[in-house]
Amino acid sequence: MYVTKYKNKLPTLQVDLIIMPHQTQACIYKQTLSLHQIFQQRKATKTLHTKKTMMSKKKESIGRQKIPMVKIKKESHRQVTFSKRRAGLFKKASELCTLCGAEIGIIVFSPAKKPFSFGHPSVESVLDRYVSRNNMSLAQSQQLQGSPAASCELNMQLTHILSEVEEEKKKGQAMEEMRKESVRRSMINWWEKPVEEMNMVQLQEMKYALEELRKTVVTNMASFNEAKDDVFGFLDNKVTVPPYVNMPSGPSNIYNFANGNGCF
């Protein structure tokens, strides 16, 4: 019999393995394997215990704990929580309006009695609709709900009114176009009006236009004078023309073939 020490990777776990002389290698391997399993179980238990300890430590932080739904006692913490929750509430309301097209009105008073509101399209319009709906009597609501003919008549009247409004809009647009055209035409010939009827802006525009017209006339006159001088200067130069000489008739004399100077 001899004793051997079986040591796991963990330095704190060490077991003496007693081996008898008559034991075979298979028995020794089996005992070693069972010890290895024991060490692995102890290691897994220790790892699980470590994880539980770490999780318990994490739960101690405020961010990981579940906040109880009771009034916050400390005033500064209560004010900070109100600001954060109010911003989150308004953000969720805005998302609901954007996604679903809902009309929402929210009024919140802070612990310091300061009001904050959020509304789409506005708080006033939502409140007006709510108040007007509550002021409607039960008999009127039942009458509207119980008479389909009245609802159909109201829809027809609404359609007729909307069509009239659309026609009036078209007429208004046409009149606006006519007014703009009239103003444009009056602005084109505004200088034909008497000077006494012009305002300061029109007088300044007329002065500027006359100055520009004078510059244009002077420039054109200078160009015209230069062209005139060139033409008349060319005409003033004398051009000598050889005198006509009477020569006897004949083909050779007319075309001067005799001298070899014929010109066609």
UniProtKB/Swiss-Prot annotation:
Classification via InterPro entries: MEF2-like_N, TF_MADSbox, TF_MADSbox_sf
Keywords for the protein's UniProt record, in alphabetical order: DNA-binding, Nucleus, Transcription, Transcription regulation
Location of the MADS-box domain: 62-122
Gene3D superfamilies per the UniProt record, alphabetical: 6.10.140.920, Transcription factor, MADS-box
Record's GO cellular component terms: nucleus; polar nucleus
Additional free-text comment from the UniProt record: Plants lacking AGL61 show a reduced size of the central cell and a reduced or absent central cell vacuole. When fertilized, the central cell fails to give rise to endosperm and the embryo sac degenerates. However, mutated female gametophytesol are not defective in pollen tube guidance and the synergid function is not impaired.
Name of the protein described by the UniProt record: Agamous-like MADS-box protein AGL61
Organism: Arabidopsis thaliana (Mouse-ear cress)
Gene name of the encoded protein: AGL61
